[in-house]
Amino acid sequence: MLNVRYKSVLISVLLLAITTEVWSMGLFDSLKVCLFSEVNGVVTNKGKPVAGVEVIQTAQINNGKLYTYTTMTDEQGRFHFDALFSHSINKVVPVQPRVPQNILFRYQGREYRGWKTSKHNYDEGGEINSLTARETSKDLKPIVLKCDLSDESRIKEQEFGSNIIGICEFQ
């Protein structure tokens, strides 16, 4: 009985050591995926900046884990989200990526859809940049949005990626 416990403990220690070594060698970085690129934006109402708007960003990896982040607009109506990264075995599996993305605004008891799309790649900047720019990381642009609460939600067709629905316009 003691021999079985000893083997179990030894195997556990070895697995922990191997996992730690693999992690420190950066092998898991090959599974790194960008779920939502960096976003800078400003919220206005009839062209005037709006402070105190709750901004909610969500992304979901292939119908799996839902990531949700919240911020508030500043006095100039500005908001910012860093790029959102995760790790997924799907990066090396031959399956079409699908990352639903949303940005929602809450202000004075109302909700406004700012951005709704599905990202079909795991590249940073993959929502709005060409494949050439993403592969070379040259001229990679963050997402820069102007979102007016008085605008109607519209469909925006893109040259790269899926259409985007919402009140936000690219800058």
Predicted regions and their residues:
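Bacterial N-terminal signal peptides that target proteins for export
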Residues: 1-9
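Feature of secretome-associated and extracellular-like proteins
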Residues: 2, 22-33, 91-171
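Cleavable N-terminal signal peptides
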Residues: 11-12, 22
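A short, Gly/Thr-enriched small/hydrophobic beta-strand-prone motif that recurs across taxa
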Residues: 31-44
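Short, ordered, surface-exposed loop/turn motifs in non-cytosolic proteins
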Residues: 48-59
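Surface-exposed loop/edge segments in extracytoplasmic proteins
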Residues: 63-70, 110-115
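Glycine-centered loop-to-beta-strand initiation motif
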Residues: 67-87
